[in-house]
Amino acid sequence: QNLKYSYIVIDCRPTLGTLTINALFACNFIIVPCEMGRYALDGFADLMETIDNVQNNDNRPKEKFIRILLTKYDARNKVSNEWVMNQLEGYRNLLFETMIRRNEAINQAHMAQEPISVFKPDSSGAQDYEQLSREFLRLCQQ
């Protein structure tokens, strides 16, 4: 059966192994998830450098093919949120407007092996991912 897809998502581990490198070569849009915490940024610069090296033949501006998705956002963590945003200062133009808020329903959905939109569609996590989907589709149509 020959299926046609508008979008294919390749979800890679947060390592720079063979699968990730191959996915970077094959893709035409990259979403880089970044947790709102100190340790999440440790490998961030390496990943961005690898993306630059892999995508160096692409003449499009970065804003056209890469976006950083901030996850596990908690508005109560003002100091750490500010610190993370300061660290990402050079990448502000690559940030999705949507942030995925910290939400226990997302963890529970992972354990249940169900999408958050099925597991708990009224949760803030489901709302955030729905908003992300709309933003992503808008970017793809530009």
What are these model-predicted stretches?
Residues 136-142:
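Short, hydrophobic alpha-helical segments
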Residues 79-82, 108-112:
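Short aromatic-enriched loop/helix-cap "lid" or pocket-rim segments at secondary-structure transitions
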Residues 102-108:
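Short, glycine-rich, amphipathic interfacial segments at transmembrane boundaries or analogous
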Residues 98, 102, 121:
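Active-site donor-binding loop signature of nucleotide-sugar glycosyltransferases
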Residues 51, 133-136:
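Hydrophobic residues within well-ordered, non-membrane alpha-helices that form the packing/core
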Residues 109-131:
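C-terminal boundary of histidine-terminating zinc-finger modules
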Residues 2-97:
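Conserved catalytic-core segment of NTP-binding enzymes
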